[in-house]
Amino acid sequence: MLFTLLLSAAAVQASTRDEIERLWNPQGMATQPAQPAAGTSARTAKPAPRWFRLSNGRQVNLADWKVVLFMQGHCPYCHQFDPVLKQLAQQYGFSVFSYTLDGQGDTAFPEALPVPPDVMQTFFPNIPVATPTTFLVNVNTLEALPLLQGATDAAGFMARVDTVLQMYGGKKGAK
């Protein structure tokens, strides 16, 4: 029974890695820094560390990362996913910056900002526009990493965060 669970977990992780690799484009998204919103500074006072242990044992400071959410107020998948994301942000202490494609927020993120065209070009150069879509943005370098398109549950989202941060660490030579 345990062997079957481990085998199925490995298959899920492999498909997750394949999906992330399709989203991750070294000539596009991964190497192109996101631009801060007009009137904001990329550098602010550094928050206290919020350590998150990855499944490979490595620790990552979630204070170095921000989740950027692209959503729509009338999207049923956003209504399903956004409360999950908000709860995870509160639980793990990461911050979420929400953009709306239709000018409307939802109950989880009622004050989402309308997305400017240049932000759309930065985040969606080679992937389809869909909602919800999330990216991890390194607050120190403004490097944006594609995270997920579509709704998922809490465990699925955190597993994706784990996988993306492991892949990022491997590409950067971190241990």
Regions found by a protein language model. Give the residues of each.
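Non-globular targeting/processing and membrane-anchoring segments
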Residues: 3, 8-61, 138, 145-175
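N-terminal post-signal-peptidase region of extra-cytosolic proteins
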Residues: 51-56, 79-82, 115-121
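Short active-site neighborhood of thiol/selenol oxidoreductases, capturing the structured segment around
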Residues: 59-75
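The canonical Cys-X-X-Cys-His
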Residues: 75-79, 134
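Extracytoplasmic/secreted cell-surface and envelope-processing proteins
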Residues: 78-79, 106-108, 144-146
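Typically the conserved alpha-helix immediately C-terminal to a functionally engaged Cys/Sec
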Residues: 79-92
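Thiol-based oxidoreductase modules, predominantly thioredoxin-like and allied folds used
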Residues: 94-117
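Structural micro-motif
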Residues: 120-136
